[in-house]
């Protein structure tokens, strides 16, 4: 399974994100923004918060050293300027708190390689008229 790093996230966002990844049996590590990026080399994904002063320098450093690393910014509230700065700096995505479980699941399914995700063994039991359209 994969390692996911949660850097400077608030408790509510960190618990939601960690909960989704731990169901899939991934390792979740909480870290402060002042860390050596060598620690991140084996990560499958990074979620960072704490405000632009914390996550932007880390994001820029990760983009220089690990350009393909999925890096998701998690910010308190919708802030167009912070969103634009994060995306321009190379963020993979930008979430506003509160983070929805479905956002995290969608991101995990779209970014992480199938080999690092658990298998989805749900079987659809019902029929939906929407599926027939």
Language model feature labels by segment:
Residues 99-108:
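C-terminal output helix
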Residues 85-86:
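Residue preferences within the helical output face of two-component receiver
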Residues 14, 34-66, 75-82:
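Conserved phosphotransfer microenvironments
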Residues 115-133:
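CheY-like receiver
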Residues 7-31:
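Two-component/phosphorelay signaling modules centered on CheY-like receiver
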